[in-house]
Amino acid sequence: MKRLLQLALILSVWACAASGQGQEAGDAVITRVEPLSWWTGMKTPLQLLVGGEGIGEYDRVSVEGGCGVKVKAVHKADSPNYLFVDVEVGKNAKPGTYTLVFGNGEAVVRYPYTIERRNRDYTRRESFTTKDLIYLIVPDRFANGDPSNDSTPDTVEKAQRESSMGRHGGDLQGIIDHLNYIADLGATALWSTPLLGDDAPRGSYHGYACSDYYHIDPRYGSNELYREMVEKAHEKGIKVILDVVTNHSSTSHWWMKDMPFKDWVHVKDPYVNTNHTFSLGMDPNAARSDIEIMEEGWFVRGMPDMNLDNPFMLKYFRQWAIWWIEYSGLDGFRVDTYFYNEKVPMSHWCKAVTDEYPGFNIVGECWNTNPDMIAYWQAGNPNHDGFDSHLPSIMDFPLQGAISAALSAPIPGQESPQPQGRGRRGADIGAVYNALSHDFIYHDLSHMLIFLSNHDIARIGDTFGHKPENMKIALTLLATLRGIPQLFYGDEMMFVTGNPRRDDGRLRMDFPGGWEGDSVNLFTPEGRAAASGEWAHAEELHDYARTLFQWRKGATALHGGKTLHFLPENNTYGYFRYDTKQVIFVFINNSDNAVNVPWTRFGEMSDKLGEGRNVLTGEKVTVDDNTPVPCKTAFVVEWDI
């Protein structure tokens, strides 16, 4: 009932604003106030972006409706159609609808604004951690729960499922309808690629060219439906991570027709593309001109680079991030193209979010396979220049490259590189050992997001040559290595495109069974059992992944334990994860021959252990030299201590 009343209140405010109610004939008409609403008890100061033709001339602003809420300052923009208004929501402020009064001589414009009661539960809920498995989906390609919104009159690009780069119709309702599948797999967190408005004329399905930071794209649903999805996910023990983009927006964003400030976005004449040189942000010898091109050049022509050095822009970005957390109750952020941002303002953005929500986790995409270059961007890292990003978590691209290399099939016609090279095709399992040997570089291993693939990398099933045995080894590594595991949708069943090279539209494929009329339904046990052809291994691999990740939820040694690993021999690799309650042993036989576990070699840990349990079969395991492990197989044992 409380939510219904809140919804009714907000809708009435929007209706009032849209109709111009409270605004006298001939006066300026306010068309936009953001944030859409605010709350009592927030640490973050409130600064309103007010938009409307001629509103910049209304520099006398006050608040009607009660004590505790007042205007502190009014700032004019370069454009006469904007004002930025600092509003103090005092400790004694009460929830309700207040009236903003804008004056220009005798002309007066009024606008209703809602202050709600803060939900204190949001500050106490745990964000995503090493206890979780994050399931990554592309919402347009996951499931279509509401065909009526596949195309909408207020968006440019219409549904075109037959095109790999078109919109296919997946939406929030489709996610809600399949939360049981995600939970049953063992996933406890859901990361969706961006859901906010993207009105690009082509390729808008990916969502990385945001055209509205305060509204869900209508082809996915609505803000209210997103909040409902978060609530239903929480009911099933699933946390929700919102994918956001701070580096760039879209040429289709409403403000590109009339920017508040001339430097709201970086504009170069002639046009300048970013140089994509990731090392510049930490290079003590870098030329300032090169750094400027990296930070201020556009990612692509359709994605304007945001100027976070503009203090009004930075406040605007801080507030929409905090607004979405408080409004929806989401549990974490993933930040796209993290180190393309101006690094100091971006560190302030991260700190503002975590100051408002202590313990809130944010993971940044710092795409580089050199450990020292990604370690720089993690909060608390002792950097040479004293810089602290305040970014809690980073994505472990070096480890992803190592796993891919260790288990990959050579590309036809391409010569295999040297073995054991980190991130190279044709390497053996030693590539994983080598990647983990760099762990001394990282400030906090518990805040490393580990993964096999994602929406920007070739399908791992293609990389592995469509070999289910390699997929099982990879899933085992993902479940048992240090860090926070993330699984790309469909990798639990080895989705493949048939192309070992990256093809964005094809690798972000539709989940079979997510659309009415699909001939295959991999969401159900019956559908997986009946699948054939390219899906022939779906049931076998899904059951394997489910066993691992359901077990992982209670494996404390994987949540906060230490790692002890041994030098690989003959393409085999053994390591222990352990804490005060549990010991887990993983033996990877990546060779073409069956071997026995050389327990004596692992005596440093195994000599202390008695009878254990095979995690994958449930069978008892004794520590002796007669434990056979077939070729291309992972062996996992646990002991309670």
Segment roles from a protein language model:
Residues F142-Y327, M346-E356, N361, C366, ...:
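Substrate-binding/active-site clefts of carbohydrate-active enzymes
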Residues M42-E106:
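Immunoglobulin-like IPT/TIG beta-sandwich domains and homologous Ig-like subdomains
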Residues Q21-E57, Y111-R124:
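Beta-strand/beta-sandwich contexts
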Residues R125-N149:
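Compositionally biased low-complexity segments at domain edges in trafficked proteins
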Residues S19-G22, A107-V109, E116-L133, N180-G186, ...:
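Carbohydrate-interacting/catalytic domains
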